[in-house]
Regions:
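Glycine-centered, small-residue-biased loops immediately flanking beta-strands
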Residues: 295, 348, 375
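Glycine-rich beta-strand-centered segment in the early N-terminal region that forms part
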Residues: 41-58, 72-119, 135
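Short internal alpha-helix immediately C-terminal to a glycine-rich phosphate-binding loop
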Residues: 145-147, 171-218, 330-350, 356, ...
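Rossmann-fold NAD(P)-binding glycine/threonine-rich loop
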Residues: 281-289, 300-321
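Adenosine-nucleotide cofactor-binding segment
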Residues: 195-206, 211-283, 333-334, 340, ...
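NAD(P)H dinucleotide-binding glycine-rich loop of Rossmann-like/cofactor-binding domains
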Residues: 78-81, 90, 117-195, 326
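Short, well-ordered loop/turn sites that connect or cap secondary structure elements
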Residues: 106-109, 291, 344
């Protein structure tokens, strides 16, 4: 039996110690102790635990953010890493080494696993593997109920059995590929929340003949701020049909918008926000900070803002906030899956910015291989070397699938992409 076969079959003796790259603070210098990994005892699993061997780990730009922010990262909740270290590495391929007594009907030694790291606890709080739960930059570690029986129901298992002969490195790419696929699935709420809180902000002299074709029947609380008479009439008419709490807060300055958070449950923000005829980028930026987790932000108007907005892009990723809009007059036209398409348009043109990076290449590959995908795929990057690799890899794939692949470097082009 060769060394690779021995590795796969677990016939080699289990070491007494394992090397671990623990993260004890922000900065690359705090990965390990003195720039070196640490030796730790290989633990014995309890009844509800697995001892796993980490076979491959992929590193992600999310790890770079974690290194920069340390305990201030949103998924570490101000954790003092000097006292409670964590480990990077959420893209992992694992092999089960030992199985606790209570798990032997579900798992077995030499079983291969991959892991879905976006884990939640009983309170619905993110406890992601490689963040809150120490990750895969270690040779051997325990996996217990925090992964195998987690989620709000305390029954969700976040490991997935891996069948077949997929390579270790390829298996570790399951998580980033899942992220790519998830980008084309609708995970955001696209209608006004039933029983939620709605804030509508406008200006009284707005002459637009607004209508609300659907959704106004959903909120339990509606806060009105300087809305035009037509919109107030719609809300008052709804209140005559059913119980709904209506609160007015008019004459608000941009600086005072933050005070509206007190009108939401637990100060968590509004489930839905509608801004009518927005003009001020500063105002829209301040209003957007009041969106609750999984909330919607609907801009209805035809006039460009007076500048660029400051939007917390991280909340789009971590809190699933949705930014919607239309030109009016139907406020409800912004909502729904039909308007908010999440898949690439069949026969269309898709532009991928930063396409030369690892995730960018995966998005380009998916677009080229998608049977009902775009006809033209534009890959842009400012790194000529990355673009050269991308073209060499994917030009044959584009030809194979009858797609047009356009490579564009804005720093080297004489004309803009639009030209």
């Amino acid at each position: 039996m060769g060394s690779f076969e021995r590795y796969r079959s677990l016939t080699a003796p289990l070491p007494a110690q394992t090397w671990a790259w623990n993260m004890v603070g922000a900065g690359v210098e705090n990965i390990g102790r003195g720039g070196k990994p640490e030796l730790e005892p290989v633990p014995t699993p309890g009844p509800n635990q697995l001892l796993v061997r980490v076979d491959a780990v992929g590193m992600c730009f999310s790890d770079v953010k974690l290194i920069k922010q340390g305990g201030q990262h949103p998924k570490l909740y101000n954790r003092d890493l000097s006292l409670y270290p964590t480990r990077l590495g959420h893209e992992v391929a694992m092999t089960v080494v030992q199985v606790g007594a209570a798990l032997q009907d579900r798992f077995y030694p030499a079983q291969r696993l991959v892991l879905q790291p976006d884990i939640y606890d009983a309170q619905g709080r993110s406890t992601a593997y490689g963040y809150t739960i120490p990750g895969g930059l270690i040779q051997f570690h325990l996996v217990g109920p925090e992964v195998l029986a987690a989620g709000p129901d305390q029954q969700t298992c976040y490991v997935l059995p891996l069948e077949g002969d997929l390579g270790y490195a390829a298996a570790a790419l399951t998580e980033p590929w899942a992220c790519v696929e998830a980008a084309y699935t609708q995970r955001r709420r696209l209608e006004i929340l039933k029983g939620g809180s709605l804030w509508i902000w406008g200006h009284p002299d707005d002459p637009t003949p607004y209508i609300f074709s659907a959704g106004l029947e959903n909120p339990a609380r509606i806060v009105l701020s300087d809305v035009p008479p037509a919109v107030e009439a719609l809300v008052r008419a709804e209140a005559r049909r059913r119980p709904v709490e209506i609160i007015e807060r008019n004459g608000l300055t941009v600086e005072a918008l933050a005070d509206l958070r007190a009108l939401t449950d637990g100060g968590a923000g509004f489930d839905d926000i509608i801004v009518l005829d927005p003009r001020s980028a500063e105002g829209v930026s301040a209003a957007a900070r009041l969106i609750a987790r999984r909330g919607t932000f609907n801009l209805v108007g035809q006039t460009p803002l007076d500048g660029l907005c400051q939007v917390d892009v991280g909340r789009i990723h971590y809190d699933y906030t949705a930014y919607l809009g239309n030109r009016g007059p139907d406020i409800a036209a912004s909502y729904g899956k039909a308007r908010n398409r999440c898949e690439l348009r069949t026969g269309g043109t898709a532009v991928f910015v930063g396409a030369g990076g690892p995730m960018g290449q995966m998005h380009v590959q998916r677009a080229l291989e998608l049977p009902e995908g775009p006809a033209v795929v534009v890959a842009t990057d400012v790194n000529a070397g990355r673009l050269a690799i991308l073209e060499a890899q994917f030009a044959p794939l584009a030809a194979q699938h009858g797609k047009t692949l356009v490579i564009f470097n804005p720093n080297a082009a004489e004309k803009s992409l639009a030209e």
